[in-house]
């Protein structure tokens, strides 16, 4: 068996990636979230596949087909709620994974980091088109509002929106193509994940100390496979509690009303994991400016390798930048809260302050604190 896994052309790749992979001996539980994301992706693809067997992407039957899945299909309700809440678990793991990357300076591995950001954007696109599929009120109006933002693009905006809609409004053509996108994108994500791992294994993993760990590495199996299995057990427990006891806690009650183009909901808002970006979008009065800010709120992550001037790797020994980092996390939580609030005073003002602070922390405060800490080291 040992000879086979080391010499067989296919098993050799798996062996070098998951069994004999030299791994730093000191990586903490914050490094578990990569494997948890892989687990989430597998859950989403499997549950999504079973849902697609019963779902119909037609405006007249989409809503009733989801109701049929929940009522008439064997364990259809469980598959549906695992898929819906699995998306939330996916994004929780994704946010922690990115947050850990920023805290421990993993962005210095720029190829891995940039592929990760492309993965983040692709996952957001997949979640957005997926949210439209049940064809409830919030699905329909969310699709209308978000796709309509593209009309802010000069010259080609209106044409682009109609091209995406497949007509002059969100209708049957839109739903059909969104279902097609939602089906294909997870497989594209899987391909990107393999590229992400390829780049990661080229350089080796980062570690909490930020020091070179080449002199102190251990094989991935059995040490980290056991550790990852424990993380997966916790994730599955949390997901089952969410899906079985609180299946609708993260959803919107408006989505239990069939889509009606003649009746606009009082507050149009996306799923909770998009609220921080939605708050940034809403805080800018200009439509094009809002769309650019929305894009930059994610793409700004690509600036981390360029803005990093610190002599030290990660924030573990850098108290000033550490404090700024936690202010950034608090700021993102405020933005998430604001995104779910109505567009009125004082929420608009808080949103504008939090949006400015978000960009200021990343573009100004963090590079300044890097320079200050570099000078302190010289003393």
From Swiss-Prot:
PROSITE patterns with a match to the protein in the record: CYTB_CTER, CYTB_NTER
Chain sites annotated for binding heme b b566: 97, 196
Positions contributing to heme b b562 binding: 83, 182
Cofactor binding note: Binds 2 heme b groups non-covalently.
Residues the entry annotates as binding a ubiquinone: 201
Membrane-spanning ranges: 33-53, 77-98, 113-133, 178-198, 226-246, 288-308, 320-340, 347-367
Topological relation to the membrane, as annotated: Multi-pass membrane protein
Biological processes annotated in GO: mitochondrial electron transport, ubiquinol to cytochrome c
Cofactor entry: heme b
GO cellular component annotations of the record: mitochondrial inner membrane; respiratory chain complex III
Assembly and oligomerization: The cytochrome bc1 complex contains 11 subunits: 3 respiratory subunits (MT-CYB, CYC1 and UQCRFS1), 2 core proteins (UQCRC1 and UQCRC2) and 6 low-molecular weight proteins (UQCRH/QCR6, UQCRB/QCR7, UQCRQ/QCR8, UQCR10/QCR9, UQCR11/QCR10 and a cleavage product of UQCRFS1). This cytochrome bc1 complex then forms a dimer.
PANTHER family in the cross-refs: CYTOCHROME B
Function description: Component of the ubiquinol-cytochrome c reductase complex (complex III or cytochrome b-c1 complex) that is part of the mitochondrial respiratory chain. The b-c1 complex mediates electron transfer from ubiquinol to cytochrome c. Contributes to the generation of a proton gradient across the mitochondrial membrane that is then used for ATP synthesis.
Protein name per UniProt: Cytochrome b
Source organism (scientific name): Akodon dolores (Dolorous grass mouse)
């Amino acid at each position: 068996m040992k000879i086979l896994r080391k010499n067989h052309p296919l098993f050799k790749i798996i062996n070098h990636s998951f069994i004999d992979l030299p791994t730093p001996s000191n990586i903490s539980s914050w490094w578990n979230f990569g494997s948890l994301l892989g687990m989430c992706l597998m859950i989403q693809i499997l549950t999504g596949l079973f849902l697609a067997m019963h779902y119909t992407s037609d405006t007249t039957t989409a809503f009733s087909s989801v109701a049929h899945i929940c009522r008439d299909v064997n364990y259809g309700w469980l598959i549906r709620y695992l898929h819906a809440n699995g998306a939330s678990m996916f994004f929780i793991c994704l946010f922690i994974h990115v947050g850990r990357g920023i805290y421990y300076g993993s962005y210095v591995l720029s190829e891995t980091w940039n592929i990760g950001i492309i993965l983040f954007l692709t996952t957001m696109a997949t979640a957005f088109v997926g949210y439209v599929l049940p064809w409830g009120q919030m699905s329909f109006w969310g699709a209308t509002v978000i796709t309509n933002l593209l009309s802010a693009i000069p010259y080609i905006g209106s044409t682009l929106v109609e091209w995406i809609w497949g007509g002059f409004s969100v209708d049957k053509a839109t739903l059909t193509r969104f279902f097609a996108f939602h089906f294909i994108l997870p497989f594209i994500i899987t391909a990107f994940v393999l590229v992400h791992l390829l780049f990661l294994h080229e350089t080796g993993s980062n570690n909490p100390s930020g020091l070179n760990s080449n002199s102190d590495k251990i094989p991935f199996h059995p040490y980290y496979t056991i550790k990852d299995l424990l993380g997966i057990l916790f994730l599955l427990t949390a997901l089952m509690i969410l899906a079985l006891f609180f299946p609708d806690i993260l959803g919107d009650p408006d989505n239990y009303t069939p889509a009606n183009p003649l009746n606009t909901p009082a507050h149009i808002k996306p799923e909770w994991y998009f609220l921080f970006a939605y708050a940034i979008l809403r805080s800018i009065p200009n439509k094009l400016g809002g769309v650019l800010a929305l894009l930059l709120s994610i793409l700004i992550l690509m600036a981390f390798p360029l803005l990093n001037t610190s002599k030290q790797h990660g924030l573990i020994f850098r108290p000033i930048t550490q404090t700024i980092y936690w202010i950034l996390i608090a700021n993102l939580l405020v933005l998430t809260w604001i995104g779910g609030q109505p567009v009125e005073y004082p929420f608009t003002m808080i949103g504008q302050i939090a949006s400015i602070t978000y960009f200021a922390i990343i573009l100004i405060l963090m590079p300044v604190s890097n320079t200050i800490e570099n000078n302190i080291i010289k003393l």
